[in-house]
């Protein structure tokens, strides 16, 4: 770790934490239906959408109706995205003439984008038409993020209300989050990215003649244009030599903006934010990192204002920031170390370079390590370098942040409702230690509440570890591993952790675009998203129905340093210890290998 990284981290956190209160206040006003600076143009459109859908925004729902509405909306989203992918060969805005996507890949991608995961087993520029990118994937980038915000707001209402039976209206929350939060921010960010060189057009791909011949491996396709696999399920490839380079075009900036602001992460291009058309320079890189954590940080402020105590939100934000800074420093330290080859050559510990494998020269080690920490602290998954090329211990940072449940800032909405589950757990543990009935924000924490909290915390580890075991035991799972041994195990563990925790990034050495992995990861994404959401809504309904208790002497304060420390400890101990055996078999074993 050097001065470059420390300066970048300090600049990043300063801008982020200064912007969070301003946006957080705006989100609170928008989600409560109060007047904002966007009301003049947004309210007529909002009312028109309600009339078109036949929705009464004032008709509130209990937690069960809220959950059913959310699930129905998301199931319809999966069907729409699947259909657009399968039919894209016959639809317009397809200048490259790309065929329909294979059924298993289309299903995996549909689940991926609807669940806010954006896991991509395909290369966007060679698989998806412009229409599919815009109408299917970009639309889901908006509404999946809005779903996360809506569920969080429902939980916050459950904490803020007392003796109540309802949590709000899902349709109203969905529309307001999209119209007043996501759309305006995305418009501003898209313009900023275009100013830095991110492409935004509907032009056909450009073919350029190169001076030197290029040789690369490409997937072998069958008569229907779908990837072929061998007898053991391994992908088949062909070697291609060419002097023609195809430069992909497309409406990149508009998708890039919501990909980041909605903590979605799915890139327009296969290289994601390492591609110069998505992330051209250091300024665009800083903007993209800020966009990823802006709304998750702001929602902490929204939470504090909605429950009537800003200090409650600041305490949660402080715990997130402490964890984030520690993981960022860890990633930078291990990536700045010499690679084994450099160490054998007796390179200086802090010599220029460090582990530059898999990193863009225009970003370097510091910006790549920070971006990796940002994208896995959030459930984003966008990358500006190759995580598979991180050192064994450097790769632990993005892996472990996902395994903690994506609560260090976390995804839009999902990060904070996950962290609030840990906050309730921390209060429960404190209550056991001092022999008092646990309370949080004046609500008594009872058996049903702790059952839902336990489900939120344990659902994803169960999916990750069970899925990893299935992949390791199955022939089709092992066939996708291109790097056998400890690192190959890490690649499978990373893929399952990313899918179940709705992150979407990858150790890309795993060949995951096969029927086996498309189905396995699709199931992990679906249940990793909606098991937790339903449990959170049940928790919100339980809390809303409780009377508010007056503050008692000797109660656990939830706004001071002691609570922050207890919350950080709960996240690390309960979240991280679950994965110690798996981490020992993967990155730790790889690090200890000679």
Curated annotation (Swiss-Prot):
Topology term for the membrane: Multi-pass membrane protein
Transmembrane segments: 3-23, 67-87, 136-156, 179-199, 287-307, 314-334, 415-435, 453-473, 519-539, 562-582
Domain of life assignment: Bacteria
One CC-aspect GO term: plasma membrane
GO molecular function, one term: potassium ion binding
InterPro entries: KdpA
Entry keyword Cytoplasm: no
Coiled coil: none
Keyword tRNA processing assigned: no
Main location: membrane
Localization, UniProt: Cell inner membrane
Record keywords: Cell inner membrane, Cell membrane, Ion transport, Membrane, Potassium, Potassium transport, Transmembrane, Transmembrane helix, Transport
Quaternary structure, from the entry: The system is composed of three essential subunits: KdpA, KdpB and KdpC.
Family: Belongs to the KdpA family.
Function: Part of the high-affinity ATP-driven potassium transport (or Kdp) system, which catalyzes the hydrolysis of ATP coupled with the electrogenic transport of potassium into the cytoplasm. This subunit binds the periplasmic potassium ions and delivers the ions to the membrane domain of KdpB through an intramembrane tunnel.
This protein's name: Potassium-transporting ATPase potassium-binding subunit
UniProt organism field: Bordetella parapertussis (strain 12822 / ATCC BAA-587 / NCTC 13253)
